[in-house]
Amino acid sequence: MHKDCDKRFFKKPEFYRLTGGNNYVRIDAEDKVTGRGKYAGDFYLPGMLTAKMVRSTHAHAKILSIDTSEAEKLPGVKAILTAKDFKWPGKLGNAEFAVEFADREVLVTDKVRRIGDDIAAVAAIDEETAQKAVDLIKVEYEDIPAVFDPFEAMEDGAPWVNGAPDTHNVGMATFRKGGTDPDEEFANAAFVYKEDYETHRMVHAAIEPHAATANYENGVYTIWMSTQLCFVDQYWYSHAMGVDPEKIRVIKPLVGGGFGGKMDSYSFGIVAAKLSEMTSRPVRMVLTREEVFQMCANRHPIYVHVETAHDKDGRLLAKRARHILDGGPYGGTGVAACAQSTIWACLPYKMRSVDVEARRVYTNNPHAGAMRGYTSCQIHFCHDVHMQLASEAMGIDPVDFRRMSVADPGYETPSGIKVTSCASKQCLDTVRKEIHWDERKDNLADGEGIGFAASGFVSGTGFPILDTPNRSSASVVVKINKLGHVTVYTGANDIGMGSDTAMTAIVAEELGLTLENTTTVVSDTHITPFDSGSYGSRVTFLSGNAARRAAVDAKQKLFEVIGPMWGVMPHTLECLEGKVISKQRADLQMPFRDAVFKWMAINGGDELTGVGSYSHEGTTAQYNSTSDDSKENFAPAYSFSASAAHVTVDKETGCIDIDDFVFAHDCGRALNRRAVEGQLEGSIGMGVGYTCFEHNITKDGKILNPNFRDYRFPTALDMPKMRTYYDFPADEEGPFGAKECGEGSAAPVAPAIANAIHSATGIKITKLPLDPEHIWRMLNGMEDDRHSK
């Protein structure tokens, strides 16, 4: 950023034109709908080979031998890769932050820990030949005892899966404590409620499967990959291959959905790169749908115990909670899930004391990692259903019960979370009004119910993966040519949510231009500036602030030339509707292009460049907080949501209809209303799937429904009437007042539906999913003995 760039040069709200009340089309929309856009599996390079992987068919076993001799004889096979081809250290991840980040080999050497572990890879002239070669490779195993239940995995004498042998398979533990003495709060409370809850495994099910195309040339590995973390992948791959990061170039093309599933430490990209080096030809690998289900990260099943203490009016005083996460056999980005789960236990409700403990346990189940909301969907289901049951036990209206305890602006949690802008009460008031709760609550028919939920989420997570030890960061560069056209260089990873458009709009707004005047160059580790990646709702807030600062930097440099020409102070100028204007004299204005040309004439013809970066100084975030008095603020801002669901339950069959869903989300100032509505409706859709349809059914570590035929999604016919509300106060720290809207909005869907089913039937709901069989069994007094694993 320009050394003299200051707040005086930031555009004031009265000059906003593009963001806020407008709907504008995404800059990648035409390429996507016409098929011109390229995804990682769409690249066809001369001489390109196809790669396939040999994967473990055993959940826990020693590898005695790998025989590739028959595959090597097959015509068309160009290379076969095994662990012996990786010199040092051959592991993916970043052990600098947590050793559990780097507990996974690129290709397994001597022990498989799950079905689907990567053992070997083949590069061949086409997919059919590659698959034949994979089938010819013989792997000899010796089975060893496996463990699939996280509670059994923590017992003495349980099979050791991963991590240090003396940790009882606990890969990560986080303790979130603070405030007054919890024992005293519970002892003196007017009412205490306790319950156990359980959530299930779910897959991201992005339309695009994971894919990579790699080309090794002139000593550089270039990898086009479906990823959420191109700079992180560059570092992880260089670490695993023992080469300098500059020798690895990761480019993120269009990505057909991520939802957290494309940010873990996978092998397919590095394997394609290594095979390209071995063959001196480009190599492409596209995972099958079955591979994505079994090998890629799923949503964590979590087992939760919650205790809450309340005063006589129902106000929340204190909370104790224990979270057990089934992480599968590896850490990866799932390491952060443990700490994240403790954050959601502290939001959105105020309390004087909190004591939350989370343990992520290694098992031989499929690997679990990040998924939209990073455990918030699971934790808010458990904790908000708990609030519903507690309100009923105390005989208090469920909305009033929540409203008296939700956070207010300026609230600081006992664990150190600092709430700034906050419309949680307004969100609850909105859904209460729009679902007509007060008129309908005493007039619901048999089998008809209304349920509510509230939640909170980070906006711009402080959890790092690469850069500073306790904060994530973003940088953006803006270049303006002699014609006044702007190019935005950002390392932010758009995975389908429209962040490229957001970055463009933020820069265009600050410079008083339209989207047509702006081009974006994104996510190329050799061209674009560093960005931590797409996770934790950080892109709009962190990368967006960096983009705005880059535009302000360029604008300030421009004004410091034009201002003296006009005899006015530089900070009294503004960019508006394609012109540079004086805010004080209407007669002083100039086309933006002409102003840039004058700047270049004075500065030797160089492009006008602005640089911006953002990392919130007040943010701290650790993966394994263990101190009783540690206080951590995880983000510069937090979003808040409330939802209301109206359902009808057929008590004969257990089938439910979600008739109406009202959603209010405090996302600050909406930059693009159409995009916000799409994110909120998408969150409802994914939440309906998580609650009522989608379930990765596993047996002995094997997913039994690893395809779109057997894994049930909600269709358009299953979706409720959706009404979304998001006009709430701007956040002072967010770019043009914006906060997140794509992840936190998924969290209150499941508890609202569960609470509505409880309202309609009276059955106590403590487990997901809520499919017809599950509901029918409970309606008929049968014990729900299904297990999330």
Language-model features and meaning:
Residues 22, 27-34, 96-98, 102, ...:
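Glycine-rich loop/linker segments at domain edges
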Residues 31, 211-216, 303-312, 318-323, ...:
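Short beta-strand elements
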Residues 235, 254, 258-280, 284-286, ...:
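Thiamine diphosphate
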Residues 1-171, 462:
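Flexible, low-hydrophobicity surface segments
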Residues 83-84, 242-247, 277-283, 312, ...:
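C-terminal catalytic domains of large/alpha subunits in multi-subunit enzymes
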Residues 459-461, 466-528, 542:
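Catalytic phosphate/nucleotide-handling subdomain of diverse soluble enzymes
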Residues 27-31, 135-144, 235, 239-240, ...:
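Extended active-site and interfacial segments that coordinate phosphate-rich ligands
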Residues 159-241, 406-485, 704-718, 723-725:
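Helix-loop-helix junctions that connect adjacent transmembrane helices in secondary transporters/permeases
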